[in-house]
Structures are given as C-alpha cells and as structure tokens.
Amino acid sequence: NCRSLVWATGGPAGMYLDSVYPAGHWGSTGAALEAGAAGQNLTEWQFGLASVSPRWNVSGTYMQALPRFLSTAPDGSDPREFLLDYFGDPASMCNHIFRKGYEWPFDVTKVRCGSSILDVLVFLETKRKGRRVVLDFLENPGGGELDAAALEPQAREYLTAAGACFGRPIDRLLQMNRPAVDFYRSRGVDLTKEPLEIALCAQHNNGGLKV
C-alpha cells in the first residue's frame, strides 16, 4: 500500500545465452510485471562484442589495439582469420576493427559503411557456422608488421598520438591501456600468452518499468 516503490533489480539478462551481464544478474522485472506494473521500451536491447569468460565488453582500446579475429572449430583447432574473407584488403579490415572501439554498441546504420558489420560477422561465424571466435593479441591482422601508412587518418593519428603505432596488438594495448591487460590476467586470462574468446552479447536494456 506504499505510494512509491524503488524496484532496483536490473533487467532480465538471464534470458540470453550470450550475455555480458554477471552470471547471477537475473533481474526481477517479471515479478513487478506480474503484480501489475507497466513496462516500457522492454524490447530496446543493446548488443555488442564481449568476452565469454570472464564476461566483459571488448570495446575501446581492446579494438583500437587492432587484434586479429580468429575463427576456430569447437575444439580450438583449425584457426582461420575469417575477416579476410569479407574485406577486400587488410587495411580495410584494420580500419573497421579500429572503429569498433568507439562505434558501440551494434548499430544497424553502421552495418554497410561502419564497424557494426563485425558484430554481424561474429554472429554468423558462431551461431550459423557453429565455430568459436577469439581475439588474438599476439599477431597483427593479416600477419606481418603493422602498416600504419595504410590506416585511415583517424586511426593512424590516434595510434601515433598514443605512442602505439608499432609492434603487435599486445604491445599496443599495453602501451595504451595496461590495466586492460591486468584486468584479464587477474581473472585467469593472460592476453600476452593466449587468445580471448568473444561472442555477440546482450549488453544493456534501455527499457524497464514505466514510471
């Protein structure tokens, strides 16, 4: 019979298999809806690339360091740099990977001419082809050395200003954001030695209970 009630439980994150929400974050919106509360914008979900274990968004410098996207068989064998099948050249692929760092989350307007095509390609690789996708920070996309001159000006100038226009993805990530590497190491994944499995994950719900 109270006049106001604060129902701070979070959204129904547990309804998605691939989710960046903490595993125990089930949400209790349904209980309020069953009790008669009205919902609003419940279909407005955001999706983006995130690591599977631990659950964490791989935006920002994780992408701007330009890691390789590898597709593997379920047992980890048969690694393939599958993005090369979709981009005309390694430079175009790298530019899309770099932009994924700040064009977040998935945006339908950025599929044809933006980085959201990466979200679609990861989804197709994992859910349609039944493979796994990992980020490899130990080798440059396309193999060989980073060709900074082939990057679009925004990416090249950003990396140059950050003192990270060199080396391998892990070298660039350590230069730009060492805590990003420490975060995974403290949770059992050493990016200096091993790849990071990712998926297209539910990341945020813009709706909830109508107030």
Functional labels for PLM-detected ranges:
Residues 1, 193-211:
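FAD-site-proximal beta/loop scaffold in flavoenzymes
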Residues 38-190:
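An anion/pyrophosphate-binding glycine-rich loop and adjacent beta-alpha core
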Residues 7, 11-13, 74-77, 140-142, ...:
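Short, glycine-/Ser/Thr-/acidic-enriched flexible segments
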Residues 11-14, 161-166, 193-195:
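Glycine- and acidic
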Residues 3, 26-33, 177-185, 206:
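Predominant activation on well-ordered alpha-helical scaffold segments within soluble catalytic domains
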Residues 26-31, 61-64, 92-93, 194-196:
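Short, surface-exposed linear patches
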Residues 35, 71-72, 209-210:
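Hydrophobic alpha-helical segments, especially N-terminal targeting/anchoring helices
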Residues 4-57, 69:
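Glycine-rich loop(s) and the adjacent beta-strand/alpha-helix scaffold that form part
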